[in-house]
Amino acid sequence: MSFNPELATKTLEAEGLRCPEPVMMVRKTIRTMQDGEVLLVKADDPSTTRDIPSFCRFMDHQLIAAQTDELPYQYLIKKGL
């Protein structure tokens, strides 16, 4: 699937933040969302390329798409499976 930020119902700007802040903010934001909603995360911390996919697996959310070829990194996360 190609990366389509228009799928997002919410956006989280995490640029300039360093581990573990981006993932903590993703967790806090997703808690306020309904199942099926999609979060667009923008970050520039290289650790997010590892941490966000792991977070999604561990917390049973779906990483719909990731763009990690250039900054800012962008992730589309669907709440729930």
UniProtKB/Swiss-Prot annotation:
UniProt xrefs under NCBIfam families: PRK00299.1
UniProt record, GO biological process: tRNA wobble position uridine thiolation
Residues forming the catalytic site: C19 (cysteine persulfide intermediate)
A GO cellular-component term linked to this record: cytoplasm
CDD domains: SirA (cd03423)
Compartment(s) of residence: Cytoplasm
Annotated InterPro entries: Sulphur_carrier_TusA, TusA-like, TusA-like_sf
Protein name: Sulfur carrier protein TusA
Family stated for the protein in its record: Belongs to the sulfur carrier protein TusA family.
Record lineage: Bacteria, Pseudomonadati, Pseudomonadota, Gammaproteobacteria, Vibrionales
Function: Sulfur carrier protein which probably makes part of a sulfur-relay system.
Pfam family, one: TusA
MF-aspect GO terms: sulfur carrier activity
HAMAP family: Thiourid_synth_A (MF_00413)
Organism whose genome encodes this protein: Vibrio vulnificus (strain YJ016)
Keywords: Cytoplasm
Gene encoding the protein: tusA
